[in-house]
């Protein structure tokens, strides 16, 4: 069950259940704008792990982009990536635990529409990013993700056999993103395509039942952990499902107010190591 609070956010709200699993978004939650993770966050996550609490990364990033951070944080837990469309082991052969891609025919239609409108769209297939050349967004995406894209004049050509776990429309004009969102939901409906923002200029497209929270619940169940025993930390629209779920959902103070209002409470700004403060408050101080 997912609840919607829409109330004034409370800093460090009281919570009665023990925390046995901590789920963290990356960008804007653990990873700062300079792409670094503070020593306080690193040290706190290691202490939480050593206390026997599961720490899991749940990100919109593709697996190869998330894995270096998982390693740096010293985690050996599975990685929830592509907004929850893929869950992979972070050890050994990176075994695929779960996959729920966008249906291939639907992906083709959406990519065809974006290309016909001159709208940038990233397509992810088999952990490889495919994008258009000569595009102002390519270099910026490479910088923030540390991923080298395969550049194709016709991105549609990659959608032959394997369906993408997600696609991302990128545009610095919010009106363009909202127009694309409106078109997709009007044309296909929320029952066929999932649409949410992960950054101010990223519109994420997934299968409709994909979310970080659904992947979190599935992992927690495998470990015998109740949803109420999970703490989730995030900052953007793509985190709302897990912030409003049955666990302790805490929004970063640096995130949009609309996101904060969906959470159980808030924690300080990322530059104040809000995620680390939350873990110390709800896990290490108990």
Please identify what each model-predicted range represents.
Residues 41, 66-70, 180, 184, ...:
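Hydrophobic packing residues within well-ordered alpha-helices of enzyme cores
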Residues 48, 59, 83, 167, ...:
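Residue-level signal for inorganic ion chemistry
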Residues 117-120, 124-233, 237, 242:
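Conserved acidic, metal-coordinating active-site core of Asp-based
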Residues 36-138:
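Active-site phosphate-binding/coordination module
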Residues 73-75, 82-83, 191, 245-246, ...:
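Short, structured coil segments at secondary-structure junctions
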């Amino acid at each position: 069950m997912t609840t919607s609070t829409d109330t004034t956010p409370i800093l460090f709200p009281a919570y009665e259940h023990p925390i046995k699993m901590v789920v963290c978004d990356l960008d804007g939650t653990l990873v700062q704008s300079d792409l670094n993770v503070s020593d306080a966050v690193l040290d706190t996550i290691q202490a939480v792990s050593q206390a026997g609490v599961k720490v899991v990364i749940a990100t919109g990033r593709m697996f190869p982009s998330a894995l270096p951070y998982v390693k740096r944080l010293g985690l050996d837990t599975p990685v929830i990536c592509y907004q929850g469309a893929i869950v992979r082991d972070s050890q050994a052969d990176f075994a695929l635990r779960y996959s729920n891609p966008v249906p291939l025919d639907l992906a083709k239609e959406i990519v065809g529409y974006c290309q016909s409108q001159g709208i940038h769209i990233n397509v992810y297939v088999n952990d490889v990013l495919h994008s258009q050349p000569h595009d102002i967004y390519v270099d910026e995406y490479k910088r923030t993700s540390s991923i080298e894209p395969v550049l194709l004049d016709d991105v549609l050509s990659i959608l032959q056999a394997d369906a993408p776990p997600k696609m991302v429309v990128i545009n610095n004009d919010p009106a363009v993103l909202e127009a694309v969102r409106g078109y997709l939901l009007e044309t296909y409906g929320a029952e066929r395509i999932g649409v949410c923002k992960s950054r101010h200029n990223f519109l994420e497209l997934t299968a409709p039942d994909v979310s970080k929270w659904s992947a979190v619940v599935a992992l927690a169940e495998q470990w015998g952990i109740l949803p109420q025993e999970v703490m989730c930390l995030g900052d953007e629209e793509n985190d709302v499902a897990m912030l409003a779920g049955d666990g302790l959902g805490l929004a970063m103070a640096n995130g949009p107010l609309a996101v904060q209002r969906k959470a159980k409470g808030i924690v300080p700004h990322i530059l104040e190591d809000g995620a680390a403060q939350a873990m110390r408050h709800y896990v290490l101080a108990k």
